């Protein structure tokens, strides 16, 4: 071991039948620039693909995106699958999560009850989500920046 800081691995993808790719592309670039190793599963990703990727890459977080308004249906059971696989990872969900979403606090509560650690709307700045990810992983900005310097 060289003593060099190893980047934290996160899994990123658009769940279900959703084919919106722009948001996760922007998020992937922002996460990479912040020093994370990003495994981008792309669009129309099944729950088992998130679970398999998290397990095979020893990920610390699974970031789920959905913009077409059916995230609740697509995410139902995801945490059961993660638990069944023996994975203890942070889970974030973000986007336009519910059709006709008018009360985001209600949407947040729904997804928190489903087991998500953080819930974001489509207007969330990537830097805000990254800062929360650093906080949740107890990762200092200095450590993340060191990846870019050494990497």
Swiss-Prot record:
Cofactor(s) the record lists: adenosylcob(III)alamin
SUPFAM superfamilies: Cobalamin (vitamin B12)-binding domain
Reaction catalyzed: (2S,3S)-3-methyl-L-aspartate = L-glutamate
InterPro entries: Cobalamin-bd, Cobalamin-bd_sf, GlmS
Pfam families in alphabetical order: B12-binding
Keyword Isomerase among UniProt keywords: yes
Pathway: Amino-acid degradation; L-glutamate degradation via mesaconate pathway; acetate and pyruvate from L-glutamate: step 1/4
Family indicated by similarity: Belongs to the methylaspartate mutase GlmS subunit family.
Listed name of the protein: Glutamate mutase sigma subunit 1
Taxonomic source organism: Haloarcula marismortui (strain ATCC 43049 / DSM 3752 / JCM 8966 / VKM B-1809)
Gene name of the record: glmS1
């Amino acid at each position: 071991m060289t003593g060099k800081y190893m980047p934290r691995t996160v899994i990123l993808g658009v769940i279900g039948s959703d084919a919106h790719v722009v948001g996760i592309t922007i998020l992937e670039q922002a996460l990479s620039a912040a020093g994370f190793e990003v495994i981008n599963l792309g669009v129309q990703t099944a729950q088992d693909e998130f679970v398999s990727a998290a397990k095979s890459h020893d990920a610390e977080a699974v970031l789920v995106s959905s913009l077409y308004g059916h995230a609740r249906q697509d995410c139902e059971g995801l945490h059961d699958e993660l638990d069944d696989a023996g994975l203890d990872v942070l889970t974030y969900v973000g986007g336009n999560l519910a059709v006709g979403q008018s009360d985001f606090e209600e949407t947040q509560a729904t997804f928190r009850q489903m087991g998500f650690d953080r819930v974001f709307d489509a207007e969330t700045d990537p830097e805000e989500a990254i800062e929360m990810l650093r906080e949740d992983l107890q990762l200092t900005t200095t450590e993340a920046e060191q990846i870019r310097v050494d990497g």
